[in-house]
């Protein structure tokens, strides 16, 4: 008897879930995406933009992303536009691990907390949906990566190997004329310039973290005068661009981000990261959730947030000079030598790897500028900030940068 063959249908294709993350190259590294996707069991899509483009898209097109990875000072704009939703800390396993720098405003009672957009002032969602420091169940952004920035300088220009008195005033030192570079971001580079002007005694700000129109006018008057004197080399947009200015010998002193020190090549021998006596310009990144997210995607967003503070990502960030809000978590993923150098500020007992885990970025015997995490965190002068006069500052800054970089207005 002949058997009747039945045609089998093709097996159903199960489509993996996907979480869309919008941010910058500060933390959206391919290694992070790959590891998080493997650990969490769903696809993760990164969209990496520069600071202004990222902020603009986050505010105006929240439907294009699920999680926003940026800095606390951005909340002045993105939260204001209603693009984000409150994050329920009761649904985050990691919340209890977050340290006092963001929850309370400082690492301890001895800390100089700085002025400007101090993260705690924008952390908690208040009953009227505004942001403030009074603790509630809901937050606008989960604190993650942060650092305390300064400037880098060519020691050959500043007394060779003898360490000078490090001050923001060095930016406009006569021997660096024509070789000064600033980061092109009004919420960042503007404050490097302001700290320098105040350290020189040229200007005095009532609150450097929230300058008045008159103070901004004076600051830009100072900057344009320095531009006409030939003080500036250029304004840069990426850390790799900044590193290149040191590698090719163009810059003598400039705004710098920690990862850039790891790619200086031979210039590592003479470029030094400063620990200015006036204090650091600090910044703090974090994760927010777009307003449209709900259901399974909201659950993935919470899982992704918890993953960020579970340890592995914090260890990776440490290898490019950044700290993580759950400071103890990365220790299990770092060697004792790495922890001693990056967090305790001790001498490197061996060559230390970068984010790829192989190439050496810190040589044996080196010591981190500024000391331990606590020592650095206690010396904050100002935070990256979106001031009340941000629109005025941004317009004036854009004109200034265009003139420095030789572009049409």
Segments predicted by a language model, with ranges:
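A structural signal for short loop-to-beta-strand junctions that line the ligand-binding cleft
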Residues: 63-67, 85-150
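Extracytoplasmic/periplasmic substrate-binding proteins
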Residues: 231-294, 333-334, 338
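Mature extracytoplasmic/periplasmic domains
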Residues: 288-368
């Amino acid at each position: 008897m002949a058997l009747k063959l039945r045609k089998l249908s093709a097996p159903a294709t199960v489509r993996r879930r996907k979480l869309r993350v919008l941010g910058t190259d500060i933390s959206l590294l391919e290694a992070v995406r790959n590891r998080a996707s493997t650990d969490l069991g769903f696809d993760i899509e990164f969209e990496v933009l520069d600071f202004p483009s990222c902020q603009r898209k986050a505010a105006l097109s929240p439907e294009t992303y699920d999680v926003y990875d940026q800095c606390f000072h951005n909340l002045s704009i993105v939260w204001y536009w209603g693009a984000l939703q409150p994050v329920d800390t009761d649904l985050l396993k990691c919340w209890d691990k977050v340290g006092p720098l963001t929850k309370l405003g400082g690492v301890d009672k001895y800390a100089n907390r700085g002025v400007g957009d101090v993260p705690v002032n924008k952390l908690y969602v208040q009953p009227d949906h505004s942001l403030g420091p009074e603790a509630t169940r809901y937050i606008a952004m989960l604190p993650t990566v942060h650092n305390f920035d300064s400037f880098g300088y060519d020691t050959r220009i500043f007394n060779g190997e003898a360490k000078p008195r490090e001050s923001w005033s060095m930016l406009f030192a006569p021997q660096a004329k024509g070789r000064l570079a600033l980061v092109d971001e009004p919420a960042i580079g503007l404050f490097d310039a302001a700290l320098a002007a105040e350290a020189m005694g040229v200007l005095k700000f009532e609150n450097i973290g929230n300058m008045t129109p008159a103070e901004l006018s004076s600051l830009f008057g100072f900057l344009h005068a320095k531009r006409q004197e030939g003080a500036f080399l250029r304004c840069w947009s990426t850390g790799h661009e900044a590193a290149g200015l040191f590698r090719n010998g163009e810059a003598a002193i400039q705004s710098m981000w920690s990862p850039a020190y790891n790619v200086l090549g031979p210039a590592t021998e003479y470029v030094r990261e400063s620990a200015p006596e006036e204090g650091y310009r600090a910044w703090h990144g974090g994760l927010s959730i777009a307003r449209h997210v709900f259901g399974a995607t909201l659950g993935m967003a919470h899982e992704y947030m918890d993953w960020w503070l579970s340890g592995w990502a914090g260890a990776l960030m440490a290898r490019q000079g950044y700290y993580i809000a759950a400071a103890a978590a990365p220790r299990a993923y770092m060697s004792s030598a790495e922890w001693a150098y990056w967090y305790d500020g001790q001498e490197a007992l061996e060559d230390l790897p970068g984010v790829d885990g192989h190439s050496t970025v810190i040589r044996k015997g080196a010591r981190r500028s500024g000391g331990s995490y606590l020592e650095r965190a206690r010396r904050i002068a100002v935070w990256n900030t979106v001031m009340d006069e941000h629109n005025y500052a941004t317009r004036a800054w854009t004109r200034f940068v265009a003139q420095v970089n030789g572009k049409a207005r």
